[in-house]
């Protein structure tokens, strides 16, 4: 067939839709109740006898320029490939993969876009039955869409994540029909879709044709209101095409049954219901049966829930309780399919959210597949449903074009904004999970948002409206005050009333916080303590759920990010910022969230008494098994199960009658383990300290024998010796014929060498700029002297290092003193003194050594079993752990410092023949080990860049900076930074035992 393809609509600002049907609720019709009952909410769109599913194989032609399409496209003479939908061009090899954060992919001249855009043409032939009405539905197409049927134009749509529907009754027929979908890469609407993600195009969600009779259901509304006596009234409206002798029967899961006719409206009063919440996701399956006489001619299912949302001054109340939204921001992203996530993919995410103790999700930054919200209804998640609006490119460089309010304060765009908000609302209006509507993200303000806000309050005044961007505009806030990455200090000021008038009088919500990029986020527990400190604080949503990355198991780099695909414009690895890896394996950040979001919290009160607090608002703890393990010096000594139930939002004192708890001479910990009684799944484990003592001072025996000859210092002890080269440091450490040190260290540094830098964390981003200015990132420890001295009444070998950058500048000086006794025990004291005035913010101070690579097995007494830092440790209780050097680091997509174990009192690394043990002296240390050096880590952009050079690189740090969330959020607070100054040198000591 021949088609005259529309060539100007995507650039015509006056047109963002043509012939598109008004937005309505998502549902799937069936011909009968019997057909409906064969399916569930996930399978219904694929199995309904009223649906012709178009997803699957299409003919596909990709044109890199619109001008390359013939004036009249003849599908019979067009060369087509085969493409499977849902999919995107970028993930199927047609267009360049590109990750962009805040920028537009074209020059900013709103509303104008490059006219000659890339276009994808999809063709499919389908057989349709005879019926009275046909509607073609696209659940998601990026960017703009024009639809044709049998050579005729059906309509046009913008708004990638909103449903687009067209009535094709008049241009379709019984039998074979040709469907053509033309997708334009960009349109005027692209100015409203500048979200932080890989920019992709294509039919990325399901599309299908609905076939209906003369009488059909088009839309419905279920709106409940709570009465003073705690019953609910339910208003029901059904719209569609209804002839005489038709009626609607509504059956609500044993709750009620009613029949409508004529106006198709009714009100059911004083229903006694089980309320919906994330803790108690009580949904009622509703069957809507359209009848002609006594015969059902159409059947529809939906789900309803009953909730009451109110704002009382500064307090957000859900079913009369001041809930805490412990949430995440969720993008549609898949490691191979990009935007084209399946319902199984979405359900996996929902299940993981619940497993990791989330109770809320923000659909950043667009409406999701409608079934995602059904899953939120059923599994129990408070949803912040966000409109497909973001104009972040007007915040971005170059600064001469910085104008964040550019579109939002231009009322010419108001109809474009409103269309997206209205379509979100109409599609999702019946979901009990929708706790707030969101007007979009990072688009400035406020005139276009005002129009959208007024619309939402006119149709759904019960549900609060959220928009973070208002905080930087004249509006300040709509129904709640929202911030991104507000610091704990800001929250404390809000509590004190000193943060400013804009933070008063409304609930406070952190729509994004704890930026989870790479290693971290740190500080999550501090946020939790603040959330629970005031009813004004609603909680927040961590940024973000999962890493965005492109996976190819056969490529040089299996996981790629911005810049890896030769794209001219990109924003690097800023997309790799999730709690979960792209394959949904949890990072240590996800483990931290799981513990911090736990529903029960314990506190030791002394005298064997503990307080257990149930942080849930609606349910007691009868579904949770609470057990405990008492450990002494990291090893379990006693355990038990508590027979107790804690009421919602309540605390209860319990007593554990164990004499161990009274022992103040040892480390005594109580680990509380919370499990789901029904499934046995661990909800969380938290550790409470009953007693914690400082490490004892390690005492050495008699001095070893020290001898010097030329450039060599030899220290001799029982069955071994240590050899120092005065120009190289400790070059050999041998006992019982075992050499502990690597003979030719990869970083060309011998012995226990001081360091002050780390493989930069993504969350070090703000500080890295400063560190690079002063040259900290390229500084090297240069050995200045190595000699025998008397110190603290003993002989030692003192090595002095200067940290030199750019060949001449000295940032700091370090002394590393080695004390030996006659048994071969070695005490090391490391001291760092300031030279450069700018080095008051260090990432770490410690020493490292390259051991013989046969040292692989690790045992330690400290925090574990996975990496942890001072502000990132709730997931890592103190204990005795065994692991291997190979398993110590985490394999982040962008390599960075990882694998640190904090609060360590003792650690050992062993081979088949020997063991080296590190003992804390007065204060615990940080311990790490891996098979690559700091230099190799710092140079790597991908994990594949790190060579396997057969070394065991061991670090004993006295001081390690926290992680914070400074890739976008706050840096670690002062107590998790390293305090270093001219009058505050850094010093610590540890002991090494060879055996």
PLM ranges: what are they?
Residues 91-93, 140, 185, 277, ...:
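Beta-strand/loop-rich accessory regions of lumenal/periplasmic or secreted enzymes
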Residues 91-96, 103-112, 158-160, 168, ...:
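An acidic-aromatic loop/edge-strand motif
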Residues 173-176, 239-310, 668-672, 676-702:
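Extended acidic/polar, glycine-enriched regions
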Residues 240-246, 617-624, 837-841:
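A short beta-turn/strand-edge loop motif at beta-sheet boundaries
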Residues 2-46, 100, 191, 295-611, ...:
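Extended substrate-binding grooves/exosites of carbohydrate-active enzymes
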Residues 3-17, 21, 44-45, 59-63, ...:
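Accessory beta-strand-rich segments of carbohydrate-active enzymes
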Residues 258-271, 634-664:
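Intrinsically disordered, low-complexity Pro/Gly/Ser/Thr-rich segments with frequent PxxP/GP/PP motifs
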Residues 196-216, 556-604, 608-610, 615-623, ...:
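Catalytic cores of secreted or luminal carbohydrate-active enzymes
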């Amino acid at each position: 067939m021949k088609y005259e393809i529309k060539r100007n609509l995507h650039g015509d600002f006056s047109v963002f839709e043509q012939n598109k049907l008004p937005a309505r609720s998502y549902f799937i019709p069936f011909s009968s109740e019997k057909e409906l009952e064969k399916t569930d909410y996930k399978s219904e769109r694929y199995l309904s006898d009223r649906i012709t599913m178009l997803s699957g194989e299409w003919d596909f032609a990709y044109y890199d320029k619109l001008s390359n399409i013939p004036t009249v496209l003849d599908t019979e003479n067009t060369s087509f490939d085969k493409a499977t939908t849902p999919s995107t061009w970028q993930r199927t090899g047609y267009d360049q993969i590109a990750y962009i954060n805040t920028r537009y992919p074209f020059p900013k001249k709103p509303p104008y876009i490059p006219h000659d855009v890339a276009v994808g043409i999809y063709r499919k032939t389908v057989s349709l039955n005879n019926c009275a009405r046909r509607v073609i539905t696209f659940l998601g197409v990026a960017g703009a869409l024009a639809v044709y049927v049998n050579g005729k134009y059906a309509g046009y749509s913008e708004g990638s994540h909103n449903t687009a529907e067209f009535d094709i009754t008049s241009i379709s027929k019984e039998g074979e029909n040709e469907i053509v979908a033309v997708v334009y890469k960009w349109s005027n609407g692209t100015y409203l879709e500048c979200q932080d993600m890989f920019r992709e195009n294509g039919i990325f969600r399901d599309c299908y044709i609905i076939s209906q009779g003369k009488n059909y259901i088009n839309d419905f509304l279920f709106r409940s209101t709570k009465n003073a006596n705690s019953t609910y009234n339910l208003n029901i409206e059904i719209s569609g095409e209804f002839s005489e002798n038709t009626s609607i029967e509504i059956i609500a899961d044993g709750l009620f049954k009613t029949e409508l006719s004529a106006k198709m409206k009714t009100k059911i009063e004083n229903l006694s219901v089980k309320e919906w919440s994330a803790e108690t996701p009580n949904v009622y399956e509703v069957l809507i049966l359209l009848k002609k006489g006594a015969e059902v001619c159409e059947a529809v299912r939906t789900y309803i829930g009953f909730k009451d949302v109110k704002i009382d001054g500064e307090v957000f109340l859900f079913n009369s309780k001041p809930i805490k939204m412990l949430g995440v921001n969720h993008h549609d992203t898949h490691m191979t399919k990009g935007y084209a996530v399946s319902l199984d993919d979405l359900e996996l995410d929902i299940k993981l959210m619940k497993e990791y103790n989330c109770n809320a999700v923000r659909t950043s930054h667009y409406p999701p597949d409608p079934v995602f919200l059904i899953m939120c209804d059923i599994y129990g998640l408070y949803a912040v449903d966000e409109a497909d609006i973001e104009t972040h490119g007007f915040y971005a460089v170059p600064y001469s074009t910085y104008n964040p309010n550019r579109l939002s304060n231009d009322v010419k765009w108001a109809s474009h904004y409103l269309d997206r908000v209205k379509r979100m609302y109409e599609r999702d209006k019946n979901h009990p999970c929708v706790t707030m509507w969101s007007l979009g993200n990072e688009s400035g303000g406020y005139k276009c948002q005002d129009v959208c806000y007024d619309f939402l309050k006119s149709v759904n005044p019960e549900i609060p409206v959220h928009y973070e961007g208002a905080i930087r505009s004249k509006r300040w806030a709509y129904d709640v005050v929202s911030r991104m990455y507000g610091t704990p200090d800001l929250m404390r000021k809000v509590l004190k009333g000193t943060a400013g008038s804009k933070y008063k009088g409304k609930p406070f919500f952190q729509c994004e916080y704890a930026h989870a990029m790479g290693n971290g986020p740190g500080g999550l527990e501090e946020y939790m303590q603040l959330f629970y400190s005031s009813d004004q604080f609603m909680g927040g949503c961590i940024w973000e759920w999962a890493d965005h990355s492109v996976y190819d198991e056969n490529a040089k780099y299996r996981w790629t990010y911005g810049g890896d695909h030769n794209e001219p414009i990109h924003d690097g690895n800023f997309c790799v910022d999730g709690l979960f890896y792209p394959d949904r394996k949890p990072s240590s950040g996800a483990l931290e969230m799981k513990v911090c979001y736990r529903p029960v919290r314990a506190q030791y009160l002394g005298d064997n008494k503990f307080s257990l607090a149930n942080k849930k608002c609606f349910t007691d703890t009868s579904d949770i098994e609470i057990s405990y393990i008492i450990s002494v010096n990291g090893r379990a000594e006693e355990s038990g199960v508590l027979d107790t139930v804690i009421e919602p939002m309540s605390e209860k004192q319990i007593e554990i009658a164990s004499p161990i708890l009274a022992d103040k001479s040892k480390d005594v910990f109580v680990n509380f383990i919370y499990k789901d009684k029904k499934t046995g799944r661990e909800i969380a484990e938290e550790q409470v300290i009953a007693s914690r003592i400082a490490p004892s001072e390690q005492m050495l025996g008699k001095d070893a024998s020290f001898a010097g000859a030329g450039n060599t210092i030899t220290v001799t002890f029982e069955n071994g010796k240590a050899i120092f080269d005065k120009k190289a440091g400790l070059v050999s450490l041998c006992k019982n014929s075992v050499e502990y040190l690597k003979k030719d260290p990869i970083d060309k540094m011998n012995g226990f060498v001081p360091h002050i830098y780390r493989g930069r964390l993504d969350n070090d981003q703000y500080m890295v700029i400063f560190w690079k200015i002063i040259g900290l990132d390229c500084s090297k420890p240069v050995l200045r002297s190595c000699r025998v001295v008397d110190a603290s009444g003993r002989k030692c070998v003192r090595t002095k290092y200067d940290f030199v950058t750019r060949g001449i500048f000295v940032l700091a000086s370090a002394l590393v003193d080695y004390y030996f006794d006659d048994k071969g025990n070695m005490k090391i004291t490391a001291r760092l003194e300031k030279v450069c005035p700018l080095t008051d913010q260090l990432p770490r101070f410690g020493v490292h050594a390259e051991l013989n690579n046969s040292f692989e097995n690790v045992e330690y007494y400290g925090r574990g079993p996975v990496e942890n830092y001072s502000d990132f440790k709730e997931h890592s209780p103190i204990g005795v752990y065994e692991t291997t050097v190979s398993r110590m680091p985490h394999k982040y997509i962008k390599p960075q410092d990882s694998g640190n174990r904090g609060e360590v009192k003792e650690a050992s690394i062993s081979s088949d023949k020997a063991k080296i043990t590190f003992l804390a002296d007065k204060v615990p240390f940080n311990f790490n080990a891996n098979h690559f050096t700091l230099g190799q880590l710092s140079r790597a952009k991908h994990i594949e860049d790190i060579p396997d050079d057969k070394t065991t690189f061991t670090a004993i740090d006295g001081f390690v900076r926290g992680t914070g969330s400074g890739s976008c959020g706050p840096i670690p607070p002062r107590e998790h930074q390293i305090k270093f100054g001219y009058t505050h040198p850094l010093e610590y000591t540890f002991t090494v035992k060879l055996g």
